[in-house]
C-alpha cells in the first residue's frame, strides 16, 4: 500500500474519532470552556509541528490579505468548535455529526445564493443524496432530548459552511505552508474561544472535568493535530484528487465511535441513510 494512502486513512480515522473523544472530555464542562481547552491542545500540537518543520519564520512572511483570510477562517473555526461542543454536550454524536456533515452542501448553497455560481446536475444529485441520507438518519425519535443539540448542530453547520466557502474562495499564498496556516488559524480560534469562556464566566466549570475527561480532551486535540499532519504528508506524497474521497470514511468512523464509546444505538434502517449520505459526499468531492 502506498505511504500516502496510509496517511490519508489515519487522518480519516482520527477525524472520525474526535467527536466521541470530545464529548467524553467536555460532558461536565461549559461548552465555551470545553471548546477553548480543546482548541488550546490543538494549538500546542500545531505549533509543535511548525517548530519541528522549522517553518516559524514563515509567519513573518504572511501578507495582509492572507492574514485577513486566516483571521476570518480562524474565527469561523472557533465558532464551529464552540457550537459543536454545545451540541455534543446536549445530544448524541450520531445525531449531531450527520447535520454538521452537511457543511459542503451549505457552502455550495451560499455560493449559489451570493455569487450566482452554477450548480451542475451531477452536483445537485449528490447534494440531494446527502440531504436524503441525513433526513433518514435524523428521522428517528429523539428520546429524552431537549432539542438544544439540534440548534447548536445547525449553528455549527452554518459556521462550517461559511468557513468552507472562505477556503474555497481564497487559499493562503503559496509561500505559507499548510502547517503555518493551520497554526495561525488555530491561534485565532483559541483567542476567540477563551474570550467566549471569559465573557460567559464558564471557567469555574473546569472543576467538574474528571481525570478521564482531561485525558479525552487531550486525545481529541491530538486527534485533530495528527490528522492535519497526516493530511499534509498525504498531499505531499500522493494524488490530491483521491484524498478528499478517502476523507469520507471519517463519517462512518464517527458513528462507529459513538457506538463504541457512548453505546449509542442506531436502527438498521438508518444504515441506508448512511450509504446515501456517503454516496452524496463521495460524488461531490470527486468534482472538487
Pin down the residues of each PLM region:
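Residue-level recognition of pore/gate-forming positions within transmembrane alpha-helices
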Residues: 12, 39-43, 101-105, 127-130, ...
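Selected transmembrane alpha-helices and immediately adjacent juxtamembrane segments
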Residues: 4, 148-180
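C-terminal transmembrane-helix exit sites in multi-pass transporters
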Residues: 84, 103-125, 135, 251-272
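Residues that define the loop-to-transmembrane-helix transition and helix capping
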Residues: 32-33, 94, 120, 176-179, ...
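Membrane-interface interhelical linkers
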Residues: 1-71, 75, 81-91, 141-154, ...
